[in-house]
Design a protein with these regions (language model features):
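Unchanged
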Residues: 1-253, 358, 362-364
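Left-handed beta-helix
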Residues: 1-4, 199, 206-368
Length: 368
């Protein structure tokens, strides 16, 4: 592969409520046995990119623990491999990252010491499967300075006002780019995936940062007169930017067509856990549910996603909910439209009920 990778994994969001108090968005557990970053990291490896940097910032401990061994993504290599960059203070720098452009600039030695001609930049906070080598070839064929991957969401329920919105002219060349516009001119949203020449990226960063320009979209994409093209992606994609989007993403994988992302090659890799298979006792009734290994089910579970080592007691009902690792649902409980974080205990006969529009969130380690 003629490119190196950069995964931006430093984000946090108040819209995720208690779910982000103890972890970065990129470390969010999704779909029974994965973390959000597994998707972008697997995409890198599966696309032939063998040198990848993960740039972290907020609540990075669990993320660094998850990435402690690069071998699961075939990135334990003598040449290339997996790099994890965190903010650091020095005599020359006493700031945290002040924007995406700044986070890359503070690790510019990674770019300068590489020899590959291109860089693929993406977020570690979205769930999707993509072959970046196809985007790179498109970028080369267009002789583009920068290629942005986008998706047309006119046939979805996504609110375009939450994203960067773009319009394109002849040959799919970028005409306008607005971040979270009040009056959107199209339904083409940026997926935060970029391809750019390594030397050009270095030049743009070295011009921008000393002037106090730290934002990647505003200060790198829009402020410079460069040839930018769009690459349309029509596969499944969702980002974890709110409680509702987190719930939606997990529920989407109850659909077998979406689940093909996980069951068809190339596979999405993750840090494994050596647990026994899930156990379904005689009183269990499970319908349209993903159940993680090591779980024990005595009650009724419907339209839900259960992570590893979840216990559901006899007579309990779990419906339209996400139950994270090592949580305990007592006998006779009713859990509906809820997101239960890790290591939560719901005592016998308790009710935790939200709505489809506003799922209730129970933070990590709580006892109800």
């Amino acid at each position: 592969m003629r490119a190196i990778g950069i995964i931006l994994a430093g984000g946090n969001s108040e819209r995720l409520k208690d779910l982000c108090k103890v972890r970065a968005i990129a470390a969010m557990p999704v779909v029974s046995s994965y973390r959000a970053i597994d998707f972008s990291l697997s995409n890198m490896s599966n696309s032939g990119i063998k040198k990848v940097a993960v740039i972290t910032q907020f609540n990075s401990r669990s993320l660094q623990d998850h990435l402690s061994s690069a071998k699961w993504w075939e990135l334990d290599r003598k040449e290339g491999g997996l790099y994890i960059f965190t903010p650091f203070l020095s005599s020359d720098n006493n700031f945290w990252f002040r924007g995406i452009a700044d986070s890359i600039y503070q690790n510019i030695s990674y770019l300068k010491r590489s020899h590959e001609p291109y860089v693929v930049i993406c977020s570690g906070e979205a769930v999707y499967k993509m072959d970046y080598s196809e985007v790179l070839q498109y970028h080369i064929d267009k002789a583009a300075d920068l290629t942005i991957v986008y998706k047309n969401v006119s046939r979805t329920n996504k609110d375009v006002h939450d994203y960067g919105v773009m319009t394109f002219g002849e040959n799919n060349k970028l005409e306008t780019f607005e971040e979270k516009p009040i009056d959107a001119k199209s339904s083409n949203i940026s997926l935060g995936i970029y391809v750019i020449k390594r030397t050009l990226l270095i030049k743009l960063l070295e011009n921008a940062i000393p002037k106090g320009y730290y934002d990647f979209v505003k200060d790198i994409i829009l402020r410079n007169k460069i040839d930018i093209y769009g690459y349309e992606f029509d596969g499944y994609w969702n980002t974890l930017n709110s409680v509702n989007s987190y719930m939606e993403t997990n529920m989407d994988f109850l659909n077998k067509d979406v689940r093909k992302i996980l069951t068809q090659e190339p596979f999405i890799a993750s840090k494994p856990s050596d647990d026994p298979p899930a156990k379904y006792n005689p009183t269990a009734e499970v319908t349209n549910t993903l159940v993680g290994t090591g779980s024990i089910i005595d009650g009724n579970v419907k339209n839900s996603v259960l992570f590893r080592k979840v216990f559901v007691g006899e007579g309990a009902t779990v419906e339209n909910s996400v139950i994270m690792k090592s949580s305990y649902i007592g006998k006779g409980c009713v859990i509906k439209n809820a997101i239960i974080d890790k290591e939560v205990v719901i005592s016998d006969n308790k009710e935790v009920i939200g709505t489809e529009e506003e799922p209730i969130v129970i933070g990590k380690g709580q006892v109800i």
